[in-house]
Amino acid sequence: MNFQSVIAKLHEFWSDRGCLIVQPYDIEKGAGTKSPHTFLRSLGPEPWAVAYVEPCRRPADGRYGENPNRYQYYYQYQVLVKPSPDDIQDIYLDSLRVLGIQPEDHDIRFVEDNWEDAAVGAWGVGWEVWLDGMEVTQFTYFQQCGGLDCRPVSIELTYGLERLTMYLQETDAIAKIDWNGTLTYGDVHLQGEIEQSTYNFEASNPELLFQLFSLYEQEALQLIEKQLVLPGLDYVLKCSHTFNLLDARGVISVTERTRYIGRIRQMARQVAQLYLQQREELGFPLLKTQSVS
């Protein structure tokens, strides 16, 4: 099964179980959790069920395309369901079956691994899912987002699309993944991986990036003051990505790192609080029956 087909199968599977299928959010981010479809919608009492592919950028993970299993740009398949179904593990195993993986024929383990994203004040309890010794999915029951309690608790499933497809295709390198029967993953992304790694570690301008962080922070704060939730979140995400670029460049000390993360987290909390306030003022309009089965 090629990479394109894996995505199509997961879209069909989760759509059939009541999930809204949305498109990737067009701001750089290090994880699908930071999309408003997850970060904001996990808050408050309104039900929500969504699935989407999210391109992720983690500048420090770049290896110029030389590491067969580690890229600084990759894809996650993100699922968020609120409230969490009681049988979510069984539903997940069914999703593997549609990809041709029969759980009874494989060593599938749920390994306890609590998750945290300190920059946006998000954390949860859950597991890594290991398939014959390789991690392919992260299960997280969200406890907080933006430093606010998640009530009810949402379940987030994050599939590692490259790892999952490598397993299905029995290949040993991301670049060798069959994308669509004609082109490989390397045909699509290898040159970009080389150039972006060069940018992340060598060609970026730290002085300019520090200035950009400050400007993005100012813009985020004034948007929050004007009670503009989504534009405010956009600029919080820009701050987060700019911080990651500075971190990859090695120009942020341990002390500075903690301070920068705290600044981002404080803005993320303000956005989350504002979102909840606005939804409450609207009377939480999505409070109606919605289920995933």
Curated annotation (Swiss-Prot):
Its EC number is 6.1.1.14. GO terms for cellular component: cytosol. Coiled coil: none annotated. The keyword DNA-binding does not apply. CDD domains: GlyRS_alpha_core. One of its GO terms (molecular function) is ATP binding. SUPFAM superfamilies: Class II aaRS and biotin synthetases (SSF55681). Gene3D superfamilies: Bira Bifunctional Protein, Domain 2, Class II aaRS and biotin synthetases, domain 2. Its main location: cytoplasm. It comes from the Bacteria. It catalyses: tRNA(Gly) + glycine + ATP = glycyl-tRNA(Gly) + AMP + diphosphate. One of its GO terms (biological process) is glycyl-tRNA aminoacylation. The keyword Membrane does not apply. Keywords: Aminoacyl-tRNA synthetase, ATP-binding, Cytoplasm, Ligase, Nucleotide-binding, Protein biosynthesis. Tetramer of two alpha and two beta subunits. Belongs to the class-II aminoacyl-tRNA synthetase family. PANTHER family: GLYCINE--TRNA LIGASE, CHLOROPLASTIC_MITOCHONDRIAL 2, GLYCYL-TRNA SYNTHETASE. This is Glycine--tRNA ligase alpha subunit. The gene is glyQ.
